[in-house]
Amino acid sequence: MEILRGSPALSEFRVNKLLERCRELDLPVSGIYAEFMHFADVSAPLNSDEQSKLASLLTYGPTIAEHEPTGTMLLVTPRPGTISPWSSKSTDIAQNCALGNVKRLERGTAYYVEVTADLTNAQLTDLKALIHDRMMEVVFTDVDSAAALFTQAEPAPVQSVDILVGGRKALEDANLKLGLALAEDEIDYLVENFTMLGRNPNDIELMMFAQANSEHCRHKIFNADWTIDGVEQEKSLFKMIKNTYEKNHEHVLSAYKDNAAVMEGSEVGRFFPNPESRQYNYHQEAAHILMKVETHNHPTAISPWPGASTGSGGEIRDEGATGLGGKPKAGLVGFTVSNLRVPGFEQPWETDFGKPGRIVNALEIMLEGPLGGAAFNNEFGRPNLLGYFRTYEEKVTSHNGEEIRGYHKPIMIAGGMGNIRADHVQKKEIPVGAKLIVLGGPAMNIGLGGGAASSMASGQSAEDLDFASVQRENPEMERRCQEVIDRCWQMGDANPIAFIHDVGAGGISNALPELVDDGERGGKFQLRNVPNDEPGMSPLEIWCNESQERYVMAVAPENLAVFEAICKRERAPFAVVGEATEERHLTLEDEHFDNTPIDMPMDILLGKAPKMHRDAKTLKVEGQAIDRSGIELEAATQRVLRLPAVAEKTFLITIGDRSVTGLVARDQMVGPWQVPVANCAVTAASYDTYHGEAMSMGERTPVALLDFGASARLAVGEAITNIASADIGDMKRINLSANWMSPAGHPGEDAGLYEAVKAVGEELCPALGLTIPVGKDSMSMKTKWEQDGEQKEVTSPLSLVITAFGRVEDVRKTVTPQLRTDKGESSLILIDLGCGQNRLGATALAQVYKQLGDKPADVDNPELLKGFFYAVQALVRDEKVLAYHDRGDGGLYVTLAEMAFAGHTGVEVDINTSESDACDDVLAMLFNEELGAVLQVRTEDLDTVKSVLAEHGLTACSHVIGTVVDEDVVRIWNGNDRVLEQSRTDLRTVWAETTYQMQAMRDNPAGALQEFEAKKDNSDPGLSAQLTFDINEDVAAPFIAAPFITKAPKTGASVVNAPAINLGAKPQMAILREQGVNSHVEMAAAFDRAGFEATDVHMSDILSGNVQLEGFNGLVACGGFSYGDVLGAGEGWAKSVLFNNIARDQFEAFFKRNDTFSLGVCNGCQMMSNLSELIPGSDLWPRFVRNESERFEARFSLVEVQKSDSLFFNEMAGSRMPIAVSHGEGRVEVRNGEHLNAIEQSGTVALRYLDNFGNVTQNYPANPNGSPNGITGLTTMDGRVTIMMPHPERVFRTVANSWHPDDWNENSPWMRMFRNARVNLG
């Protein structure tokens, strides 16, 4: 084993945060220094050249001052017997760098701890808990112990459970020991069936049965028979959901039978490479819409980052594994937790009711969980465009007496939408003899029993089992798998996939039987064919673990070679683990032990498990009206604005990429001031169309404490009032996902669940013409524990989260909450679907005063809601609405405030909508949460708007309440009485406090403070655009039609590599990607539009010699996470070029040709900056390292094009315009001041960050990474090679910009870059 010291692992502020945690735990720790330590398992001693190469490979990341470590060393490494994602990716890089003697690399972190007193054993345990993840890592106290990383344990054998002798008791004991969560009737069922088979079950068979039949997988409660108050009910919960489909399935193509639902999309030109030539082009066809929303509540409570991360990963796989392969497109996340209680920022309504030790608190969930969800989406390459965040934890008088209701078991929602080909919506048959394949990462001993564990109330399983049920993530692996699926579906009728499922709860023990069962087959499997990174695992652990990033599929034998070639090119691991059989029987053979751990008929596993029956009693609560005595209006506004459900959520948004794909038409951030208040998310269906897709969310969970049905109806209603801001057209074009969370079995809750499902499934949705083709249930939303000898429990309210998906006619017509002051005189209209009832039960106002209230808002008249939707749609389509915001948490007051924040303007309104001189209840008028919306319309259009509202029966509930004023004010009148006059800037600051506090705790506190202070500046002019060229001029047009001499790229022996002169021939553009790159398609689309022939080139094509760069005119290295950024962002990619002779020679020759050009964006920028020794004229280029915030930053940033020789920026110097930024490692790092001066004097700086005043800035977040002098793009001395961190390819279309001036047409100013490249070639 070779040992190599690495760079320091923690920045100064990270060390300070760790020391702060030590102080909180009363640990006598005075200092901490940490550095990476690398371990290499070699097959032979490395020679000096190999040692030098390896040392260079393992030198990466930002330069942090090193010092000789002192103090006690604690070495954190991956658990021996496991192989970490870092290890597999860095080993891949080493192999690609011709380091064949390196069998495996692994990394640890050495912490050197200085103490003021000896640590006790308990203190040492506490310290270790701060620095390692006990599921995945261990702590050693000496370096030599790390040799255990490369030792392999002997496989453990299968264990049988002796029911033939021990009877039922033996199975009961196994049930507890293995955490199977089997019900009493299931135990009887298994004893009976295995006795009939005349043999004992093996532990692997029992675990497989438990997973496949868990509540998580089988949805027993939703499929149960029901008796309520002694009356047998006609329908199960699921049948009532399916009723929506029976009543209306006009545009639904697949429901209830696959991993995601499918609805009709638009006919567009889908843009992807030809499977044969690998040249990108448009394919005119239907882009149908995938819909899925998952929950990952239990793992997120135990370990928030991996819990939320794998929740997002699992939902992405669901979309990819729909039909014969789908394409995930855009994501959403949501969190409901108990009170945050931010230290030093505790709020008056936040009481501490305690929690069990095995779960983390709400604050920890919200500091870590959103990062996990965002990180997976970011690295996979899916924009996260939508979400919600609610806190609730209160002692209330409910139908069960006084009890604590809250979310100690959190809700973690992960969802999204994608696209699928029309011919791939339905799965095929599995032919007998089909090869059964596992695609993706290796088996690891994690996530055991996840399906069963999540089906129990928190506290019913042992703590070790709870922790064992959490999975760990590797999104870069999932990206590789998705690339394989993409290559398959892009083959159309030749798609080799016959059947596909994702691997989720229960691992392959659930996925493979489900695969063959759905295909009406049996299966014969080989255990030792399963890719396995932990050889010491038992058969149960190999078969049942929930290692992530895996898919199972059936491929006909004649298509196997094609599939194998695709996997090899994408470097996606796969294995044939079995064959489909005619007989519906399941066999698993283990050649290591020469036995058969599983041998059972399919119908015992999946066919005849007992059906559940639920007997429920209705319990209702009579709430008390809100006590107004302690509520003062001004103070109430401050409290409500600080409630997390209302408060600004920037800390949850800027950590997530919102521009990848180049198809995002509406993200959360609105207007020139980028305020996170969008009503819904919108994407374009492709790059050649304005058709698209929209999604919105709705949830009002505290209302269920007063009225189960009202809570469910409001969730649907809110999703509709949100999505109404997009151009949908027909309401039947909207489909819903319903995610149900319930503390099943809690008094009154079962009947309440039935009432809520009936309210939407049998009543509201059929009345509106809406379908619920997809959803999920989580039926164990309760946490129990013992504290100080007292039994405690926190029970969640019944929680329905609705997500609405809709096809969009024209994405340009989406209306945001941004109030406009540049459109002439305007009026504000309130549409009040509560029709003046102004009910305050379970509102934000009630919550911040620790009350519940009596009557909540409701959907009393479905026809009124339908009329509202169609009226707003008519106004949106005719462009009669300047701004739109639905009324939700915080009521009318918050709606108006958020619209003012987005428009950076003032509002003046009169809330008296009655016939009398004044409204008789100001508090209720301002803070009720009845459904509705506020519209800003031109005063000249007011009569037209009123006419449309009247046509849809809305006259009685529509009121002109005020206007926009060009002042820093929110001024509210009640008739002639001015009841509130507040500074909008002050309110904006209050609204931002929660996000600031969370950012300061989680990220670099200095940057968080800078961002918070910037929000206090009322003089901030917001984003703007000033161009030095004509945005509408297509400078490339004359060249696209002219003759062009091109040399066809060498992409294999079949291509004739001869010069040809073709009229209108296109220059050849290599769209270069490495494993983990995710921004290549939008890059190809931009160059294609500029007149290039864009070709998909994978690094594996170059390393294999299948593609030669000499045939290309241009080369672009694209953005993403090559190798998961394990050896520094872009550095592993660069070193696989520098240290591989085949690749090095090709790149060096290409860069030296004077008839080529190159571009590196984001990850490609980082990669090319590390190739400077091969690129003439790039000697001064800096490195790009971790952002100063130490956080992934997704911003819409203002930049200025500098005067340089870059061919891309010809005639663009001096132009200022916003651009998408998405990176975690974009900070320019120079060697010293002299290096920086040399860069500045060389004239190679091409782009700089500006603040909104037009000044070059280093201030956060206008400069999102802290680069000196705002530098974010550079070029070579001759201008042929340009590198930049921002993403012009994601915003080349105007509609893809988060904000843009109204006079921009189809192409944004960034299109000029790509056209300049075409002009340069002549």
From Swiss-Prot:
Annotated keywords: ATP-binding, Cytoplasm, Glutamine amidotransferase, Ligase, Magnesium, Metal-binding, Nucleotide-binding, Purine biosynthesis
Residues the entry annotates as binding Mg(2+): 718, 722, 886
Residue stretches in coiled coil: none
Reaction it catalyzes: N(2)-formyl-N(1)-(5-phospho-beta-D-ribosyl)glycinamide + L-glutamine + ATP + H2O = 2-formamido-N(1)-(5-O-phospho-beta-D-ribosyl)acetamidine + L-glutamate + ADP + phosphate + H(+)
E.C. code: 6.3.5.3
Any one Gene Ontology cellular component term annotated for this protein: cytoplasm
Compartments (UniProt record): Cytoplasm
CDD domains: GATase1_FGAR_AT, PurL_repeat1, PurL_repeat2
Catalytic residues identified in the record: 1162 (nucleophile), 1287, 1289
Family: In the N-terminal section; belongs to the FGAMS family.
Subunit structure: Monomer.
HAMAP family (UniProt xref): PurL_1 (MF_00419)
Name listed for the protein in its UniProt record: Phosphoribosylformylglycinamidine synthase
Species in which this protein is naturally found: Photobacterium profundum (strain SS9)
